Amino acid sequence: LKMNVDDRGSFTEIIRTGSAGQMSVNISKPGVTKGQHWHHTKNEKFVVVKGRGLIQLRKEGSEEILKFEVSSDKIQVVEMIPGYTHNIVNLSETDELVTLMWCNEVFDSNHPDTYFDPV
């Protein structure tokens, strides 16, 4: 598998399908925020399997921020719906945050449907 690594951690596509989207694993270094974008059509689901984090969502055009504290101590799914900018923050100062991510569409670099906007 190809790990896309930078100073924030890594992002690795695990499974790509034509009909069921894709699964990926995201590793965030301590204190790092990832995301800060929204999609027109992509629907994503995040599941933290190691560590402790904060997922934040904000509907485009709104100032209200929805916050979800997530951790491997209580496995749950948080959904990123189209039209909501979102991020995930690693709340630990020492441990990595590992998140499984499912998206209903595979990533297409010619049509990324990813628009930067801080939560």
Predicted features by range, described:
Residues 59-83:
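Short acidic-glycine-tyrosine-enriched beta hairpin
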Residues 45, 67, 87:
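Short, surface-exposed charged micro-motifs
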Residues 20, 32-45, 72-74:
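A short beta-loop-beta micro-motif enriched in histidine and acidic residues
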Residues 62-64, 85, 89-119:
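Double-stranded beta-helix
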Residues 4-36:
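A short glycine-rich, His/Asp/Glu-containing loop-to-beta-strand
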Residues 11, 35-37, 55-57, 78-80, ...:
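Short beta-strand His + acidic residue motifs that chelate non-heme Fe in jelly-roll/DSBH
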Residues 41-60:
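Glycine- and acidic-residue-biased ligand/ion/polar-headgroup-sensing regions
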